[in-house]
Structure formats: C-alpha cells, structure tokens
Amino acid sequence: MRKLDLEYKIIGEGRGVLVIETGIGGSFYDWYPIVEKLKEHFTIVLYHRAGYGKSQNPSTPRTTKNIANELNCLLEAIGIKEKFILMGHSFGGLCVQQYAKMYPHKLKSIVLLDSTSFNFKSLYMLDIPVMKEFIAINKMVESNINSSKKSKEELKKQNQNIISAYNNRISEEDMVAVEEFFTSHMLHKTIAQEFENWDTDSKDIKDMREFPQIPLIVVARDIDLAIKEWIDYDIPEKEAVLYENQWRRLQRELSEVSEKSKFIIAQGSGHEVYLDRPDLIINSLNIIIS
C-alpha cells in the first residue's frame, strides 16, 4: 500500500515512537490536546483508517486483520523501523490486540485504553434487556447505514454536538477538516462495516498465537461514573451495574495476557480516558520510556 493512501500526521521528535489507533468513528483531531503534551518526549504517529477522513475508501472488508495489515504497510512506507509503543482506544484497542499477534516483533509495548475485549460477546449474554436495545451491534450497523444515506447538511445537524466540542481545541483550518470528517457518507458506511465484523475479529484474535510477552498497560474507566452515565440515558441501575462489572472483568482479563502488564483504573474518567485523564496516560507512557 502506498503511504499516501492513508491520512496520517507525524508530530514531535522525541526518542520514543508512539502510534495511536483511534476508537470506532473517532478522528485523530480528538487526540491533539494530549499529543501537545507528549510531543517533547515522543514521535507520535496519528492516522485515519481506510474510510475515515482523507484516507482512501476501503478496498477490503473492515476486519481488525485487514486494519492491522494496512497500519503495518503505512508504518513501513513512512519509515518506522524501530520498535514502537502502540496505543489503542475502545475498538482501536481491539485492532491493537490483532496487530500485536500479527507483528509482535515490531512492538516495544502496548497501551489499551478502555479497550474493546476479544471476549466482548460476554456482555451480550447478561440479563440487560433495556441496555441491549441501546448497544446491540445490529442497531449500531443499521444506524450508521441510515446515516450514510443522509445529506451532508443532515449529517452536520446530526453530529453538531460532536463537531462543536472541538471549538477552541483546534485551529480553524482543522475545524473545517473535522466538519468534513463527521459529515462523510463513507465514514458512516465504514463504521457499519467495522461493527459488522466484530464477531469475526473476536474469533481471529482468539485463534491466533499467544499474546507477546511485552510491557502492557491496560487502563479501565471508572465504574461508578460509568454507571451514573448509563442511568442518565435511562438504563436501569441494575443493568448498568451488571454491564459495568463485566466490562471491568474484561479489562482485567486483557491485563492478564502479558506477564509484564500493569492494570490502572482511571478514577473520574468515562470511556474517553484520553480526554478525561490525560495525566494518567502521560504518566504511564513516561514509565515505559524511563
């Protein structure tokens, strides 16, 4: 794959290379505030997966296997030769798990930020009927397919809260790119395709070789805060507690795949740990390179 097929940015000139894999539907502009604080000590690679931003349209199914392969091609094309730290958030963390099993020799360490688990299906086996209507994979797929058919103006209105949250955080030029990002029909089509393949992704990751025994940091969200957020969305407290307890168990399970792991609870943070607790992530990364 030619390097210009995927949109990327290299920021900083620090001695450690840090590659960031964003969550599903997320842009790398989200990461600018924390990247500003990291660029003195790290060379940071941000990129948009195929179908996101200015990257090419997907040419293969949106599986974590294909995503990992495409990331590897990009890193080779831009000349990343030394071992690097790979950090992933949410679904991006699932992509990181896949990459780690496919290219273990290329990694210095891994950071998983409230990552989707390879055993995510256990969440759907819980007795949480109301929440299942809210988080069902088929609902996510259907919703994004519907969004992909809307006009740009309709998508701008639909995503106005997301877009406006970037105000005063990035430049005016980048604000134009953010609006383009979230009003893209291809973005929503790609998100639907990524969700569609979660079952395949889970099986692939579990069927592959053992996880590499390299330093691993797993950061999990604050259970009490997450439960409160679910209740604010009219999810019954009992269901929210069941779900969040299982999510925490899955995070701990992720930390057990390497004997060189550290498990951290991000007190006061919801799912977007990199926005809520950047200090915690910065400290964790500094431990890795010290």
Predicted feature residues:
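Catalytic active-site module of serine/aspartate enzymes centered on a nucleophile-bearing elbow/loop
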Residues: 249, 257-290
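Conserved HGGG/HGGXW glycine-rich cap/lid loop of the alpha/beta-hydrolase fold
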Residues: 7-54, 74, 102
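Active-site loop/oxyanion-hole signature of alpha/beta-hydrolase fold enzymes
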Residues: 49-87, 91, 103-106, 129
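Flexible "cap/lid" loop of the alpha/beta hydrolase fold
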Residues: 111-148
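Conserved serine/cysteine hydrolase catalytic core
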Residues: 170-265
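Conserved hydrolase catalytic core segment
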Residues: 82-125
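Alpha/beta-hydrolase
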Residues: 20-21, 47-49, 113, 220, ...
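Alpha/beta-hydrolase active-site loop signature
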Residues: 25, 49-53, 92, 117, ...
